């Protein structure tokens, strides 16, 4: 079975049905650390303004007190990749595919199904906190590694920030993706291209109900198509050629 790994996002949208608060047991040590930080401490850890830290402090306290509303993760996150992912007006078949094949890698919740109910937060693996003596990446590494099953086929739509949580052996077990645009005869990539293409790629996978590696090679989305010349068995490259 194909399993897609996608990152979280800082931007969020609350315009969805709320669910009761829920929280994985593994995440409580992280929440304990966050709940004991002051607004000023959060500002330093997250590298954000104190106004933004005040908002995040209130979110954390709500999580800590089990009063934070939760929403399906794939609908709550609203970064650029998620805005290019079709999330509304899905057919029952498309919704089932998304729920069964797509997993989100979170610094707070671990690896969760795309539809897992989560609360608003902005924690990521660049946040400067320690859980005991461990960084967030080391805290989650064993759990992330155990998620990877040799009997499944994984497609990584992760940035390096999230891929680096996994050990090298696990990273060698998936297919990574790269999205390039042709400009003046040269192939270029940057963050905006990658984020848009990841969302559109996943939308195409859901629409086509991809079941195999071969299916991934036939996709065509927002002008991108598979490049057999630049791709390898462990890295699939998609190119958007100049008009």
UniProtKB/Swiss-Prot annotation:
Any one Gene Ontology BP term: response to hydroperoxide
InterPro entries assigned: YaaA
A cellular component annotation (GO) from this entry: cytosol
Family per record: Belongs to the UPF0246 family.
Protein name according to UniProt: UPF0246 protein SUB1767
Organism from which the protein derives: Streptococcus uberis (strain ATCC BAA-854 / 0140J)
């Amino acid at each position: 079975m194909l399993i897609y790994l996608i990152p979280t996002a800082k931007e969020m949208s609350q315009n969805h049905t709320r669910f009761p608060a829920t929280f994985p047991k593994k995440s409580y040590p992280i929440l304990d650390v966050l709940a004991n930080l002051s607004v000023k401490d959060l500002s330093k850890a997250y590298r954000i303004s104190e106004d933004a830290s005040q908002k995040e402090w209130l979110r954390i306290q709500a999580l800590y007190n089990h009063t934070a509303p939760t929403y399906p993760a794939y609908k709550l996150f609203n970064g650029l990749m998620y805005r290019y992912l079709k999330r509304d007006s899905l057919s029952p078949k498309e919704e089932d595919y998304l729920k069964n094949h797509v997993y989100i890698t979170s610094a707070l919740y671990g690896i969760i199904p795309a539809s897992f109910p989560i609360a608003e937060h902005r924690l990521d693996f660049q946040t400067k906190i320690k859980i005991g003596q461990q960084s967030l990446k080391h805290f989650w590494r064993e759990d992330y590694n155990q998620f990877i099953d040799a009997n499944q086929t994984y497609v990584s739509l992760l940035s390096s920030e999230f891929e680096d949580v996994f050990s090298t052996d696990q990273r060698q077990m998936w297919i990574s993706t790269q999205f390039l645009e042709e400009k003046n005869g040269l192939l270029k990539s940057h963050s905006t291209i990658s984020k848009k293409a990841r969302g559109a790629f996943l939308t195409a996978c859901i629409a086509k109900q991809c079941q195999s590696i071969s299916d991934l090679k036939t996709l065509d989305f927002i002008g991108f198509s598979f490049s057999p010349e630049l791709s390898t068995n462990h890295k699939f490259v998609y190119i958007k050629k100049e008009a």
